[in-house]
């Protein structure tokens, strides 16, 4: 296998020699860092079971190796990798899987360990969405996830991934993660803080990741991480679970941050050992019970994961002085709700009691019920999903709602060629037109969007920003 030419600062190498446990070889560490990273995917069980997914892709001759710490995760090798990007396969476009590095599946596995079933979860640094979508799948779209992202440019990507995966229980915010301890004290059953870090573990994906590395920079980052974990711990309810993770390898940003938190709140922080999280987890476990994953252990990116429980109430932070502003939505009730539900069912869309209808001007939205107690405490960028726009002839159903809520009542199956045309933003001309004037078009049994019948043509409503060019779908696809 070809090797990457990785840049290693001398001080970094000295630090790693000291950090490596005695049973791990430094030469093996360097060799692992220089190997290209194995690609991996996670099946989106909100849309398809692992068993059905494996059956669906079996004709493609993909080599799928299970990731030991995530039942939905697989390392993937494909013969047609050069001819067709993994992100252009039909299964990815329709949200059946997420391209996610294997080690980054660890934090969510830890968050839900020992049958933990939280109703209110926060993902403090959520973009691009791999862990938010993994959390949503583990929650079965129930409860609520507050997915926060500080970087404005990454919020759009986060929403696009949430929408593609058919997720309805997310509320998006755009804040510095340090605000939540004061803004939403003791509000969450579980919190994931996948903290911004120096990224020492990603050199297999980015050989130049350490070009700007320095000990001083790491210490500055660690100071920010301490502020973030302190805020997250305040936002966690007593009895709740906090998972802290990074994709870096030094102790300053990992073990030391967690130990600092315990020093601040010795009676309230309980470290929960991760040695039995999955078979062979003991190979990466630290004396404190954390997982410090060096890249040679499981042939993946370097990663760190710690799990802790809040065992007592702690002194609250000062209440925030900012004003959230007026909330522009109003809940819908009674006849209005019944009218929308009936129209949606006719269009082939349905939802359960976890979602409630709200309106802003002519927009109809579905919000997760569990978010309602947070309204007025923080400003949201987006909550739930936009279901429809009201117009004089009824409702114009929105793409994200169709992807998440479509059932089998009003569907029209596209062929392989027609589905490719759909993703290219083109109208479709089926041999036999549907009987309904408006249908949910599907491929492989999964919704692609809403089409309006105009004569023999199905008018494409696929959002322009999602339209794909070039080659689509898998070479070995035997279905038509």
From Swiss-Prot:
Entry keywords, A to Z: Cytoplasm, Methyltransferase, RNA-binding, rRNA processing, S-adenosyl-L-methionine, Transferase
Protein name stated in the entry: Ribosomal RNA small subunit methyltransferase F
Alphabetized PROSITE patterns for the sequence: NOL1_NOP2_SUN, SAM_MT_RSMB_NOP
CDD domains, sorted: AdoMet_MTases
Enzyme category, top tier: transferase
Pfam family, one: YebU_pre-PUA_dom
SUPFAM superfamilies listed in its UniProt record: S-adenosyl-L-methionine-dependent methyltransferases
Gene: rsmF
Family statement drawn from the similarity comment of this UniProt entry: Belongs to the class I-like SAM-binding methyltransferase superfamily. RsmB/NOP family.
Catalytic function, reaction form: cytidine(1407) in 16S rRNA + S-adenosyl-L-methionine = 5-methylcytidine(1407) in 16S rRNA + S-adenosyl-L-homocysteine + H(+)
Role of this protein: Specifically methylates the cytosine at position 1407 (m5C1407) of 16S rRNA.
GO molecular function: RNA binding; rRNA (cytosine-C5-)-methyltransferase activity
Active site: 247
UniProt source species: Enterobacter sp. (strain 638)
E.C. code: 2.1.1.178
GO cellular component: cytoplasm
């Amino acid at each position: 296998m070809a090797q990457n030419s990785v840049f290693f600062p001398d001080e970094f190498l000295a630090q790693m020699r000291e950090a490596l446990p005695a049973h791990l070889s430094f030469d093996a560490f360097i060799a692992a860092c220089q190997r290209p990273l194995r690609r991996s995917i996670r099946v989106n069980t909100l849309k398809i079971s692992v068993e059905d997914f494996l059956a669906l892709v079996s004709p493609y001759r993909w080599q799928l190796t299970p990731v030991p710490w995530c039942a939905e995760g697989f390392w993937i090798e494909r013969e047609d990798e050069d001819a067709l990007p993994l992100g252009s396969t039909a299964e990815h476009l329709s949200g059946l899987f997420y391209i996610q590095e294997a080690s980054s599946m660890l934090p969510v596995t830890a968050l839900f360990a020992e049958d933990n079933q939280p109703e209110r979860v926060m993902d403090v640094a959520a973009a691009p969405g791999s862990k938010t979508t993994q959390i949503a799948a583990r929650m079965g779209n129930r409860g609520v996830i507050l997915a926060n992202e500080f970087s404005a440019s990454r919020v759009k990507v986060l929403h696009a991934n949430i929408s593609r995966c058919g997720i309805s229980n997310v509320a998006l915010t755009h804040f510095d993660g340090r605000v939540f301890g004061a803004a939403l004290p003791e509000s969450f059953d579980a919190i994931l803080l996948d903290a911004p870090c120096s990224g020492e573990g990603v050199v297999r994906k980015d050989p130049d990741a350490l070009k700007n590395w320095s000990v001083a920079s790491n210490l500055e980052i660690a100071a920010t991480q301490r502020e973030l974990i302190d805020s997250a711990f305040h936002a966690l309810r007593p009895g709740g679970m906090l998972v802290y993770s990074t994709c870096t390898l030094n102790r300053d940003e990992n073990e030391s941050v967690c130990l600092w938190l315990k020093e601040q709140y010795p009676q309230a922080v309980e470290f929960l050992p991760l040695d039995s999280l999955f078979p062979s987890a003991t190979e990466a476990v630290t004396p404190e019970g954390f997982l410090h994953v060096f890249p040679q252990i499981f042939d993946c990116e370097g990663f760190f994961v710690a799990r802790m429980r809040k065992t007592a109430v702690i002194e609250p932070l000062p209440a925030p002085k900012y004003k959230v502003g007026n909330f522009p939505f109003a809940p819908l009730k009674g006849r209005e709700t019944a009218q929308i539900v009936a129209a949606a069912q006719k269009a082939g869309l349905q939802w359960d009691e976890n979602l409630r209808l709200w309106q802003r001007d002519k927009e109809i939205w579905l919000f997760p019920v569990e978010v309602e107690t947070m309204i007025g405490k923080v400003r949201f960028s987006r909550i739930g999903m936009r279901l429809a726009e009201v117009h004089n002839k009824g409702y114009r159903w929105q793409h994200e709602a169709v992807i998440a809520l479509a059932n089998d009542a009003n569907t029209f199956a596209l062929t392989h060629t027609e589905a490719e045309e759909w993703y290219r933003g083109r109208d479709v001309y089926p041999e036999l037109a549907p009987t309904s004037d408006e249908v949910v078009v599907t491929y492989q049994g999964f919704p692609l969007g809403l089409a309006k019948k105009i004569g023999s043509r199905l008018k494409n409503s696929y959002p322009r920003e999602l339209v794909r060019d070039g080659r689509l779908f898998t070479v070995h696809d035997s279905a038509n």
